[in-house]
Amino acid sequence: MSRPSSTGPSANKPCSKQPPPQPQHTPSPAAPPAAATISAAGPGSSAVPAAAAVISGPGGGGGAGPVSPQHHELTSLFECPVCFDYVLPPILQCQAGHLVCNQCRQKLSCCPTCRGALTPSIRNLAMEKVASAVLFPCKYATTGCSLTLHHTEKPEHEDICEYRPYSCPCPGASCKWQGSLEAVMSHLMHAHKSITTLQGEDIVFLATDINLPGAVDWVMMQSCFGHHFMLVLEKQEKYEGHQQFFAIVLLIGTRKQAENFAYRLELNGNRRRLTWEATPRSIHDGVAAAIMNSDCLVFDTAIAHLFADNGNLGINVTISTCCP
């Protein structure tokens, strides 16, 4: 989608660096879109999958599909006796030849199998060669991922796997919750009750007290097309001495689902307009990377004041579906 035109961005409710006040709803006129006023807030093992190893040449890519008992037996040789994840290169053994993964090894004083010494470190080069010829299951196979991967590709895939647990998407709240996609909205409604939800494809996101000092987040939910979208406006000092606002829309859903939608943010007033149109990001991706790359609506405090009214900034938010 396009970058902001000579019109502008839009934003919403804080979940940030001070205790969040209750959102106030701005009375809407008869026909216009819904509007919510959001007050600024203050600062704010997975089990090893059923084995699905496939023999491949060294460095050979991933795959998916049924696996033989022999493959299961082979990959089971790499299971860590402590966490039951796989022991991947560099592979270290105790003096008796037992394996333990590098993460668990750092927490142990002796071998969990024979109680022998773990030092000095002894590389098991033979097992490393075998590991390079095997495809390992993704650690999230138990929740639906069917990929098997070379050990060099496994960590990177698992960092972005669609089947990994979802984290709380509320920015600035330092919430450590994790769970399934189906449980995200329930978590937000019970643990973050100050977040307002508005219904409809077109709403007005009214962020209040935008002149608050320091880093502040405004967050609001928008419900339409059978999905929930999270509207986020962040104010932060990305560059020293230069505060900026970043506005973005996230889908409470997968990356594939997000591709079915587009959003438009618009600042409008005083015979000026600033717009941004893009595809929403999945909450699996979060907002940090988008802000780092300025892949969202970005404007500084001077621009914000052109559209603000007594320290309050209204952003028009429109969600639409994309043609297949």
From Swiss-Prot:
Binding site for Zn(2+) 1: 138, 145, 157, 161
GO cellular component: cytoplasm; cytosol; early endosome; intracellular membrane-bounded organelle; neuronal cell body; nucleoplasm
Region (Disordered): 1-42
ZnF (SIAH-type) residues: 133-193
Outcome recorded upon mutating residue 26 to A: Strongly reduced phosphorylation by DYRK2
Biased composition (Low complexity): 33-42
Enzymatic reactions: S-ubiquitinyl-[E2 ubiquitin-conjugating enzyme]-L-cysteine + [acceptor protein]-L-lysine = [E2 ubiquitin-conjugating enzyme]-L-cysteine + N(6)-ubiquitinyl-[acceptor protein]-L-lysine
Keyword Transferase among record annotations: yes
PTM comment, free text: Phosphorylated at Ser-28 by MAPK14, which mediates the degradation by the proteasome of EGLN3. Phosphorylated at Ser-28 by DYRK2; this increases the ubiquitin ligase activity and promotes degradation of EGLN3.
Activity regulation information from UniProt: Inhibited by interaction with SNCAIP (isoform 2, but not isoform 1). May be inhibited by interaction with PEG10.
Residues binding Zn(2+) 2, per UniProt: 168, 175, 187, 192
UniProt signal peptide: none
Compositionally biased tracts (Polar residues): 1-15
Enzyme class: transferase
Pfam families listed in its UniProt record: Sina_RING (PF21362), Sina_TRAF (PF03145), Sina_ZnF (PF21361)
Pathway note: Protein modification; protein ubiquitination
GO MF term set: transcription corepressor activity; ubiquitin conjugating enzyme binding; ubiquitin protein ligase activity; ubiquitin-protein transferase activity; zinc ion binding
Positions of region (SBD): 130-322
Record PTM Phosphothreonine, positions in chain: 26, 119
Tissue distribution: Widely expressed at low level.
EC number: 2.3.2.27
Family: Belongs to the SINA (Seven in absentia) family.
Function: E3 ubiquitin-protein ligase that mediates ubiquitination and subsequent proteasomal degradation of target proteins. E3 ubiquitin ligases accept ubiquitin from an E2 ubiquitin-conjugating enzyme in the form of a thioester and then directly transfers the ubiquitin to targeted substrates. Mediates E3 ubiquitin ligase activity either through direct binding to substrates or by functioning as the essential RING domain subunit of larger E3 complexes.
Name recorded for this polypeptide: E3 ubiquitin-protein ligase SIAH2
Organism, as annotated: Homo sapiens (Human)
UniProt lineage: Eukaryota, Metazoa, Chordata, Craniata, Vertebrata
